[in-house]
């Protein structure tokens, strides 16, 4: 599995023979100026909620690549109305796609679409096939619902957790989240993009290490091979 960090909460993941794009937000992110979204080959987009910093490039990329977006019902309807192929899910549901199974799980956050319309409930995704499994938390606070993931999904290879604080949980709560989901390899997201969510990398990584966890704080454009 190849994982490429495209900034903020956006990742390109090669999984199950398909190219997945998580929360597309590139053109509007000045930190990701080295990423050309027109170079991305995408089969599916997984969109956790409707905020612009998670869905900002979904229309452009969806129109160019004909990728299928996977999102909650309200976001799916909004995308379809703009000519994007999309599949609707909701919290607690799962579906087997041609790259693996996707389960939509709880996130504690807010959600409104860029035009001000209702974005429905925010969520996260657990994705798995016969050999690997990962959790995309989306924007969320620490929530006891995370304890359900090890009970209902395969053991996680890694998890993508927000840890910039202010708008999501900070790294201290992300450590607790990693314990509740029984995952030892965490890839951080939703940090350093804007001034309020800048973090101390050294302190965060040391805190994870003290908890017996590995934290990767990727640089934009970095590729991780698992």
Regions found by a protein language model. Give the residues of each.
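Short active-site oxyanion
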Residues: 1-2, 63-68, 132-134
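Binuclear metal-ion centers of metallo-dependent hydrolases, dominated by the metallo-beta-lactamase
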Residues: 68, 80-93, 175, 179-226
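Active-site neighborhood of phospho(di)ester-bond hydrolases with catalytic His/Asp-centered motifs
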Residues: 21-23, 42-50, 70-73, 135-140, ...
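Active-site-proximal loop/helix segments of hydrolase catalytic cores
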Residues: 113-123, 128-179
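Active-site environment of divalent metal-dependent phosphoester hydrolases
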Residues: 28-29, 51-56, 76-79, 93-96, ...
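Glycine/small-residue-rich loop that forms an oxyanion/phosphate-binding "nest" at active or ligand-binding sites
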Residues: 56-113
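Pre-active-site segment of Zn-dependent metallo-hydrolases
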Residues: 12-51, 56-60, 74, 110-116, ...
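Zn-dependent metallo-beta-lactamase
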Residues: 1-19, 26-29, 96-103, 109, ...
């Amino acid at each position: 599995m190849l994982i490429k960090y495209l900034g903020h909460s956006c990742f390109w993941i090669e999984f199950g023979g398909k190219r997945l794009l998580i929360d597309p937000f590139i053109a509007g992110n000045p930190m990701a100026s080295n990423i050309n979204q027109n170079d991305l080959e995408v089969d599916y987009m997984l969109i956790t909620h409707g905020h612009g910093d998670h869905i900002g490039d979904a229309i452009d990329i969806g129109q160019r690549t004909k990728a299928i977006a996977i999102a909650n019902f309200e976001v799916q309807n909004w995308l379809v109305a703009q000519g994007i192929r999309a599949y609707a899910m909701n919290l607690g549901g799962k579906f087997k796609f041609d790259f693996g199974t996707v389960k939509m799980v709880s996130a504690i956050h807010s959600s409104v679409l860029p035009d001000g319309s209702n974005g429905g409930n925010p969520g996260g995704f657990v994705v798995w096939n016969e050999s690997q499994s990962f959790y995309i938390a989306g924007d969320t606070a620490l929530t006891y619902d995370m304890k359900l993931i090890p009970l209902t999904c395969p053991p996680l290879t890694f998890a993508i957790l927000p840890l910039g604080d202010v708008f999501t949980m900070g790294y201290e709560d992300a450590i607790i989240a990693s314990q509740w989901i029984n995952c030892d390899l965490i890839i951080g997201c939703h940090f350093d993009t804007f001034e309020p969510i800048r973090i101390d990398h050294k302190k965060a990584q040391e805190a994870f290490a003290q908890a017996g966890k590995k934290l990767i704080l990727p640089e934009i454009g970095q590729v991780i091979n698992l």
